[in-house]
Amino acid sequence: MNRIRPMRATTICSIVASGIFLLASTQSQAAEKDIHSSPPASFKKVSTLVKLPDYLPGMGTLYVDPKTLPVGPFLGYDRAGHLVNVIYMVPLKEMDEHKAFTNLGSVAAGLKINHTDIEFNAGHPGVEEPHYHVTEWLISHADHEKRMK
């Protein structure tokens, strides 16, 4: 009879530990799923912050946490409202000064990147100085060409 009690305690501990693991895993998946269909609460639509259209062909509808400007990350959503890219806008001046950019994009941690594009931009509303767009795409290049017009 003493042998049964330790087994039951072990079983109960295993069940509780499994439940905690599943809860944490489910919450992590829910948070990740949420960012795929809508940005975090601290992110604002870029078109409400600067004079830009709601949808930018080739980039999508962009959202950014204003505290992270000018670098971002900017979250880009396609016309159907799906997250398709994460963009950083890195000013040339800061690169020339050898500034370190650390822990960028923790809001997007765990996303599966398909490919990365790096493109020069001479400046636009919101980031007027010359900078590079570092775009981490979550969709293939072919999908990018097709969906982001």
Language-model segments: residues:
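Bacterial N-terminal signal peptides that target proteins for export
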Residues: 2-15
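Bacterial N-terminal signal peptides
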Residues: 13-24
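Metal-centered catalytic cores of metalloenzymes
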Residues: 30-149
